[in-house]
């Protein structure tokens, strides 16, 4: 019997980074209807930085969270509606609102050393009848044993699964393998993996995760996402089918959604350009890229220098304000 792999598609959440959070509710509904018809298990919807993310710091979205969720929930027939929540950005009220509009799955995302700040949100989600998944961001920054400790915390709070998340697209297949194997051996809940393609390794890393025991993996149509994007859902489905895995996704239909519905809405090609490659090389949070590109233009400095310095400083999600500081200091140094 073929091994079942659950695909969570994040085109309508991670993909929001690549369009500056400007998908309209109508565009989201159109994409979601296609993903649903293709057989995607779970469709994640929200601002790129999760529920409540629309703000000056993270970028204002084209519409409110509830407008997106309402629009998507009305077109789903089989897929589960999911959301992302970062404690400190999203609130318990946001969770309650999401549940009201039909969200069945929430991924509670914390920095890879801070699972404890997600305890309240995991427990509230469970009380609301939602599937709650712990999402350990920037997992390349700590060794496997630290991720084990944090994954066990999420499990103790009641999480239904735990994700190892390569937010910077900085991992190699070996990095993924040792982390997934360690966490898989330590928890009794399913383990998942979320990839970014900044080193061109998103699909390879996702396969390494599956071989190491992950049964939940992420993708986005056309790879739409922060930095160089994510694992392309349509490629992931094709490769997993060749390897004998069962995803429940219709390959032709997911190809059609990617090419005919998502591609025309893309602002720029989702490629590993020099800026995205610098993200992965430096190990910098993927959503920093567009902010860094704007700062580079404003201060007339090389975006790569900004990203490398942010990596040296070991910045994490939530420290977007440092991008301008770094760009300013580089500009000042260049004039001396």
From Swiss-Prot:
Q: Which CDD domains match?
A: DRE_TIM_HOA (cd07943)
Q: What are its E.C. numbers?
A: 4.1.3.39
Task: Return the Pfam families for the record.
Answer: DmpG_comm, HMGL-like
Any one GO MF annotation of this record: manganese ion binding
Per the database record, which ranges form the Pyruvate carboxyltransferase domain?
5-255
Catalyses which reaction(s): (S)-4-hydroxy-2-oxopentanoate = acetaldehyde + pyruvate
Q: Which PROSITE patterns match?
A: PYR_CT
Q: What InterPro entries is this protein classified in? A: 2-IPM_HCS-like, 4OH_2_O-val_aldolase, Aldolase_TIM, DmpG_comm, DRE_TIM_HOA, PYR_CT
Its family remark reads: Belongs to the 4-hydroxy-2-oxovalerate aldolase family.
In its UniProt entry, what is this protein called?
4-hydroxy-2-oxovalerate aldolase
Question: Species name for this entry?
Answer: Carboxydothermus hydrogenoformans (strain ATCC BAA-161 / DSM 6008 / Z-2901)
Q: What is the lineage of its organism?
A: Bacteria, Bacillati, Bacillota, Clostridia, Thermoanaerobacterales
Q: Which gene encodes it?
A: mhpE
